[in-house]
From Swiss-Prot:
Protein name: Nucleolar protein 16
Role noted for this protein: Involved in the biogenesis of the 60S ribosomal subunit.
Residue ranges, compositional bias (Basic and acidic residues): 64-84
Organism superkingdom: Eukaryota
Record keywords, A-Z: Nucleus, Ribonucleoprotein, Ribosome biogenesis, rRNA processing
InterPro entries in UniProt: Ribosome_biogenesis_Nop16
Subunit annotation: Component of the pre-66S ribosomal particle.
BP GO annotations: ribosomal large subunit biogenesis; rRNA processing
A Pfam family of this chain: Nop16
Location in the cell: Nucleus, Nucleolus
Family to which this protein belongs: Belongs to the NOP16 family.
Organism classification: Eukaryota, Fungi, Dikarya, Ascomycota, Saccharomycotina
Length: 218
């Protein structure tokens, strides 16, 4: 015999969010671009997929929610040696930090401990405030760089193709009713509040009717 709680749950209009439902929500069908669709990994999130393909999910900077990586001194020094020509700020060595009192010259995430010469206890901590240039997202390694090239070629090819907009069945019926009532008098069409409810201009109505005539052989 089922419990009262289970009977209430069975009658409830709120459906239980099962794993099967979650999987359906996760499986996004990508139809907008055939190249992205071919390289899409359904086991990853949208942001992870974009990052893997070398794309950005958001054009702006992150507003929060991302944990910033604090680089160690050894990592900063390795980065300085690798990018010595392009480095805009000098990253001090360990021996240099030991003699620094200015927080603005110590890298953020590092600190200098000042100890008592007699007891060797820490009497002061100077936290670094120097901002070290973060590695830009565009400099990160892309798993499949050929995708970017394919997307650029696809965009260039399709930008030259002019796609003609076809009039819908509803639009055809609307234009037909206007033409049957007014013929080629577009100024009168313009002032018809019942048929021209969106107040299309005479020029716009003329273009639509010329296109409709061409499609219907009139």
């Amino acid at each position: 015999m089922t419990s009262v709680r289970k009977r209430k749950m069975a009658r409830s209009s709120v459906k239980k969010n099962t794993r099967r439902t979650k999987d359906k929500q996760r499986n996004i069908n990508i139809h907008s671009n055939p190249i992205i669709e071919a390289n899409w990994d359904k086991s990853l999130t949208l942001k992870q997929n974009y990052k893997r393909l070398g794309l950005r999910a958001k054009l702006g900077r992150s507003a929060g929610g991302d944990e910033r990586k604090v680089e160690s001194l050894s990592e900063l020094q390795a980065k300085r040696e690798k990018n010595q020509k392009n480095q805009s700020k000098h990253v001090p060595t360990v021996s240099e930090i030991e003699n620094l009192d200015d927080p603005s010259r110590i890298p953020e995430g590092e600190a200098r401990l000042i100890r008592d010469p007699e007891t060797n206890e820490v009497i002061k901590v100077i936290y670094g405030t120097m901002k070290v240039d973060d590695k830009d997202e565009s400099e990160e390694e892309i798993e499949n760089p050929s995708v970017i090239k394919q997307l650029e070629e696809y965009a260039e090819k399709n930008s030259k193709i002019k796609k003609e907009r076809h009039q819908s069945e509803r639009e055809n019926d609307w234009i037909k009713s206007l033409y049957e009532k007014y013929g080629d008098d577009y100024d009168k069409m313009k002032w018809d509040k019942k048929l021209n409810i969106y107040q299309q201009s005479a020029g716009d109505l003329k273009r639509r009717i010329i296109k409709w005539k061409k499609a219907n052989g009139i």
